[in-house]
Amino acid sequence: MTYKFYDTCSLLLKVDNLWEDNVVVVLSSITLEELENIKTAANKDPDVKYAARKLAHELDEHFGDGSYTVMIWNNDLMEDLVETHLPITNDSKIIICADAYMNLIEPEDEFIFYTNDICCKHMAHLTLECPICSVEEEKYDYDGYKIIQMDDEEMAEFYSNLTVNKYDLYIN
């Protein structure tokens, strides 16, 4: 069996293609807390808030079917964290949850930790003895301009409706 442990950032990036055959998604209860905070935060990007809500629905749809499990943060894990001398942050708590879960599975099972958070990745390399990966992000190379071909009619339409951003241009 393959177990893929996701931190909050990587889970939000993976929301549209999270479920795989013969793979158990593992997350920490800390991640669930962070998702709740993201959903209700006034200062978060609307796309991130949407991804958090969508992820909550995905988890609800798959509750109890064995496709994911949650490692619950507890006082024993806090003792483990203190022993590592890592700073006490949500990232380090998630890493300690991953380490504890990794110790629960069979040695022949595959365990992969996913994070797109650079600081979390550094701490994971110091703590975990497993592959540490990032979720592939959609790349967009912004070069500062778009070349748009318009005929006379389109040009007239463009200049008569300057408030309409028909070409999805970034506004300076």
What do the PLM-derived regions correspond to, one by one?
Residues 2-112, 118-172:
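Active-site-proximal, substrate-binding regions of enzyme catalytic domains
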